[in-house]
């Protein structure tokens, strides 16, 4: 799908594609991404037909792409849900598109992400959304509630932040609590921090990960 060669960093396999990194680590999972706060993530593919053929050849149970449909959902190992969307105008083979949250408190989520990360509130089709450079955050009203992400197949999401140490100090001054406060990891040449949003989404913040 991403047509990229993974780079190994310790226990991590890192896949780079336009505007995003996908990090894989072998671990036990408490459940699929569907049913958690982050229901799925979406990528765009320039050649949808070729992409679906490759996924089918790789063993994925592929749904039929309906005429006029913008994309399809596939389920990877461990139940990670991925939406593949068609964008023939894309210059790269694949690119990140959106992260899709499911929770009953969508308006509050939209406000929190816009304020915390300096995003622009918007609508994506019928959904509340926030535009952040490189990715769209989409929020769907899900009355049944959703489980926290930590420990599930899609364990956390992440954002690359310039001057992360100063950014973390700003969040702390605003009352944000960190699970892992800002620190430098010299062996990886990055700065990082972890926090959990008010609805249970585990979030990694990095400074330098985009150089991997």
Spans of model-derived segments:
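N-terminal, post-signal-peptide region of Sec/Tat-exported proteins
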Residues: 1-29
């Amino acid at each position: 799908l991403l047509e990229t060669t993974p780079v190994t960093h310790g226990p991590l396999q890192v896949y780079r594609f336009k505007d995003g990194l996908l990090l894989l680590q072998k671990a036990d999972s408490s459940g699929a991404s569907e049913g958690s706060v982050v229901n799925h993530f979406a990528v765009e593919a320039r050649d949808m037909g070729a992409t679906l053929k490759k996924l089918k050849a790789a063993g994925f149970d592929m749904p039929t792409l309906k005429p006029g449909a913008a994309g399809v959902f596939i389920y990877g190992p461990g139940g990670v849900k991925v939406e593949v969307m068609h964008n023939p105008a894309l210059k790269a083979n694949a690119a990140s598109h959106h992260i899709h949250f499911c929770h009953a408190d969508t308006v509050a989520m939209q406000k929190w992400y816009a304020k915390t990360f300096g995003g622009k509130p918007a609508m994506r089709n019928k959904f509340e959304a926030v535009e952040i450079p490189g990715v769209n955050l989409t929020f769907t009203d899900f009355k049944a509630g959703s489980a926290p992400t930590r420990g599930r197949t899609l364990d956390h999401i992440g954002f690359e932040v310039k001057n992360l140490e100063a950014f973390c100090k700003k969040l702390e001054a605003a009352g944000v609590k960190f699970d892992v406060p800002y620190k430098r990891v010299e062996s990886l040449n990055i700065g990082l921090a972890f926090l959990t949003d008010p609805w249970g989404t585990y979030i990694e913040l990095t400074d330098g990960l985009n150089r991997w």
